[in-house]
Amino acid sequence: MWAFPELPLPLLVNLFGSLLGFVATVTLIPAFRSHFIAARLCGQDLNKLSRQQIPESQGVICGAVFLIILFCFIPFPFLNCFVEEQCKAFPHHEFVALIGALLAICCMIFLGFADDVLNLPWRHKLLLPTAASLPLLMVYFTNFGNTTIVVPKPFRWILGLHLDLGILYYVYMGLLAVFCTNAINILAGINGLEAGQSLVISASIIVFNLVELEGDYRDDHVFSLYFMIPFFFTTLGLLYHNWYPSQVFVGDTFCYFAGMTFAVVGILGHFSKTMLLFFIPQVFNFLYSLPQLLHAIPCPRHRIPRLNPKTGKLEMSYSKFKTKNLSFLGTFILKVAERLQLVTVHRGESEDGAFTECNNMTLINLLLKIFGPIHERNLTLLLLLLQILSSAVTFSIRYQLVRLFYDV
C-alpha cells in the first residue's frame, strides 16, 4: 500500500513560503488595481453587460510573487553544504538547474508582460518562448546532455531498444516550451479558465511528483515540487480574483509564465511525455483550432463565445466570410469537419447569399455546440471538469497502459 512520503526540510520550507505567497497574491492584486487602470492596462469583459474597466495583465503580480518566493528559497536545498562535515562536494549541477530554470521563467514573464503592453502579433508570440527557452536548453546540455530515448515496444524491431535523437531532442524540447506557453493562451477567453486549467495541471503534477518520490528519480521530482508548489498557491490566489465574475484579467503574462513553468519542470524533471499527457484538452484544442490558426479558414481577432443578453448564457461565436474567398483546402476542411459534426456551418448568409459562417473552432465553442447555451460560470466548471478527467486518464496511461509500450 502506498504511504505518503516523508518530505525533506527544503520542501517544507517551500510549502510555508508558498502559503505566504498565496496570501501576498490575494492581497497585492486589489492593492495594485488602480495602478494598472491608471496605466491603461485594463479592458472590458466582452461577455458582460457592464462596461466596467477591469485591470489586465495580473499574471505579472502572480509571477513576481512566485519569483520572490523562489529567490528567497534558493539557499535551502543546499543547507547541508553550509556545514562542511555534511557536504562532500557542492552540487553545482543542481544549483545551475535551479538558476537556469528561474532565468527561463523570469524571461518569459518579462516577454509576456511586453506582449500585454505592446499587443504583439501571433508570429511574434511564437518567437518569445523560443528565446526564453534557450537558457533552459543550455542547462540541459551542460548538466545532462543525454539525447537517447527508449523506443516503444511496437517500434523496437525497426529502431532497436535505444535511439539517439541528437539535436532533434533539443528541437523537441524547444517546441515543447513553445507549445506549453501558447496552449494555455489559445484555450482562454472566459472567467477563470486560464488560471483554473493551470491550477488543475499543477495539482496533477504535484500528485505525480509525490507518488514518484519513492521511485528511482526522487531528486528530479523534488526539483519539480520546488516550482510546482509555489506555482499552485500563487495561481490559486490569482484565481480567487479571476473567478466569475472576474475582477481582474490574467493577461498573456500569466499564460506564458504558466506554460514556461510547466516546460521547465517537464524538461529538467525528465517527464516531458507525462507532462504532455496532462495537456490532453490543450492538445485537442490546438489541433481543432489549427485550420483557423493557419488561416485555412478565416480567423477573427476574438474567438470567445458571445453573450445572449436575454438569457444571460454564452452561445457559439462565428466566423463569417465570403464563400468564394475560401481556398480549396479550407473548403475541404470545412466539409470534413461538418460531416464529423465538429462545426456548425450556415451557407448562403446575407441578402445576396454570398457569405458562409461557421462556429469558431475552439474547444469552448465545441462544448457549446454539444450542450447548447451555458452560463459562463458553468462553462468554466465544465472545462475544468474535463481537465480533471484528462488528468485521471493520464494517470491511467502512466501507470497501466504504459506496460504495453515500455518495460516497467
Swiss-Prot record:
Its EC number is 2.7.8.15. Mg(2+) binds at N185, D252. The lineage of its organism: Eukaryota, Metazoa, Chordata, Craniata, Vertebrata. PANTHER family: UDP-N-ACETYLGLUCOSAMINE--DOLICHYL-PHOSPHATE N-ACETYLGLUCOSAMINEPHOSPHOTRANSFERASE (PTHR10571:SF0). Homodimer. Belongs to the glycosyltransferase 4 family. This is UDP-N-acetylglucosamine--dolichyl-phosphate N-acetylglucosaminephosphotransferase. Pathway: Protein modification; protein glycosylation. Signal peptide: none annotated. The keyword Nucleus does not apply.
